[in-house]
Amino acid sequence: SPALKKLGVKNRSRLFEIPPHIEYLTVKPHMKRYMQVSAEIYGVLLKYVAPEDVHVYSIDEYFIDSTPYLPLYKKTPRELAQMLLDAVLEATKIYATVGIGTNLFLAKVALDILAKHAPDFIGYLDESLFKETIWHHRPLTDIWQIGNGIANRLHKYGAYDLHGITMVPEAKLYKEFGVNAELIIDHAWGREPCTIA
């Protein structure tokens, strides 16, 4: 949790790694219930968008291509997001967050880094905002698809944020990461070639 992170406890720590002076509760997961609620939320979304425009990314995350729905509902992306958040809250009593982006990567980063700290639970990124707000964000491991292993390998080249990655010669990145360098480079520039379709 963010509170534990502030106390220096790393994400995905094992219980014995938590310092003894920190009080905490362990709560057993209720996967059956989580799956039921996830299905409820998915059902709410399908009242507003077609299944072919939704990609279920995980039990608690969805990508939605909202392009055809903006003119249909006569809403901006933020207004549509708020409409969906309100519908989910009304149906499930669960507060959700939304990341809006001009591509899947920017939407995911807007969710992970901006929305969870926004008062309205909505984060937005386009290519120019990405360079202003995310390009120099640290640590790299906050960025979607960059784990500790990849981050440590990037650190060898002096890259500690996405902007730093853009400064590394591409040939070095391809030598280090092979074909996976292409995605790392695209993401460093805020690009994402994949779509929901």
Where are these regions (language model features)?
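Gly/Gly-Pro- and Ser/Thr-rich, intrinsically disordered tail segments characteristic of DNA damage-repair
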Residues: 1-186, 194-196
